[in-house]
Amino acid sequence: MIGAGVILLPFILNKMPQETVGIWNIFQTITALVLLLDFGFRPTFARNISYIFSGVKTLQRDGVQHTTGNAAVDYSLLKGTLLAMRRFYRWMAFIVFGLLVTAGTAYFYYILQKYSGDRQDAMMAWVLLIAINCYNLYTFYYDALLMGKGYVRQNQQINILGQAIYVGLAIGLIYAGFGLTAIVGSQLISTIIRRVLSYRVFFTQEMKSRLSAAAVQDPKDILRAISPNAIKIGLTQAGGFLVNKSAILIGSAFLTLEEVACYGITLQVMDILARCAMVFYQSYLPKLAQCRTENDLAGLRRYYLLCTGSMIAVFIAGGVAWVFLGNWALDLIHSQTHFLPTAMLCVMLFIGLLEHNHAQSAGFIMADNRIPFFIPSLASGAATVVLLWLFLSPLQMGVWGLILAPGIAQLAYQNWKWPSVVIKELWGK
């Protein structure tokens, strides 16, 4: 996903007018909103799959069963968990379809009234967006299986191949004049290919035979065990969405599509930079779960220092390059849209660094199957929405309001709380 965004963005900015870029950013935000209907089950499933392959025999509501390093895998528990995942995501896909066809289409029709571009292309892209979101959610657990099993390298290879296909198709179709349809259609094809490959990697002949021979634990019991923390994660993600993504949806009602486009592409590149900064952390997630099951505090300290140090280094290096070279690079490709001014960009970088530092610390807590941060996350999200309305409507702060609202909401508590909790837990300070 990181590489695809970096490679494709210049072509989008070069060939598409600002209004179309604004619609594309709205699409990206709607996709992020749809994924909230996962309710936190994907990271919870991934973490519990890691526990199962570490040898646990039961899944607990809070905490984790400690094991030795050579405990056998309980395939009966794994089989029941797989069945629970399939049932859950099947129902979620049906719900997403209903919401997008009704409320989603009504919202998009309202936005199109301000759009002077090709509305037929935009509506076709919207139909494809509905299809990709439903299919993506229906097969969402495939990523959890690979990450939980520890197939980090294979998962990355599949993503690289899928995104290479996505970029190649999208660029060709954009230059063939297909507009938004090119991007969304290419995403759909890429997602199907990635899911097929993920299935083949996890469900080997050996895995199929072991699962076939195993009894199955009741999926309802498994869902009851993991649902409390999954819902807490889901509420945390909902708060995170309100903090990080609601500005696009709310801002589009108060600002022009051109302003939304400038803010949106800046946010897109910020997301790319943040994902690069979090690569080490994402790669070590299965190891964090294993350290928790084995109560290995020394290992957790080592991973925390490595992940935090790499994240800060990438943010600083990438941020400096972006500030000095960002708009120059856009001029080089004759982009019709530019990044926000330097002062705004620097503030966004600082806010983004604090955000991902506390999110990473929360991940270390979550590896122990504890979710103490869901209420603060919801409170931060609600505060962000209130501040957005205040800054955009009565105060009319424009894009500055989009930037400052989430930063102020997070700085009040979450930015400092969770790093301090992890440091105290691991070092006793």
Language model region names:
Residues N133-N159, T181, C346-S377:
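Membrane-interface junctions at transmembrane-helix termini in multi-pass inner-membrane proteins
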Residues F39-V73, M270-E294, A367:
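Helix-loop junctions and terminal segments of transmembrane helices
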Residues N25, R61-W91, L223, S227, ...:
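Interfacial transmembrane-helix starts/ends
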Residues M1-G55, I231-E258:
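Signature of the first transmembrane helix
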Residues G98-G117, A317-Q336:
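Short membrane-interface helical motifs at transmembrane helix boundaries
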Residues L13-T20, R153, A164-V196, G326, ...:
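Membrane-interface helix-loop junctions in multi-pass transport and translocation proteins
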Residues L180, V184-Q187, V196-N244, N295-A298, ...:
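Interhelical loop/hinge segments that connect adjacent transmembrane helices in multipass membrane
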Residues F27-F39, T236, G240, N244, ...:
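Transmembrane helix-bundle signature of multi-pass secondary active exporters and lipid flippases
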